[in-house]
Amino acid sequence: MRQDAIYARQSVERADSLSIDGQLIRCRFEAAADAREYIDRGFSGKNTNRPAFQRMMDAVRAGEIGRVIVYRLDRVSRSILDFARMMEVFEAQRVEFLSATEHFDTAQPMGRAMLNICIVFAQLERETIQARVLDTY
């Protein structure tokens, strides 16, 4: 029997961002009781070079995971290319992807399109933040 996986990420502790604990609490409402939790603290979503994310993907490739649950899409990736690669692996392994706060029916063409539109805006937000940081120096 394949398990659910919950993935949570927070790049920095800020008062205006949802904590890892907050993400986990919301995702647990969607997950089976025995869900595995993968947590990356202090890692950006600009790429997938994150220890817990890589462990989760290894479990997906091994056929151990049947569903991945995130609080919000941008917690898993802020890169169009990385997100597309992840979704290809999920599709090949028949893994369902679920955002606990955004409702996309990825079984339907419109749901898949909306998912891709959201990841475009997640990448745009990351690049805008990077530009602002560079402007301050």
How would you name each of these model-derived features?
Residues M1-T136:
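Short, structured surface patches at the beginning of a domain
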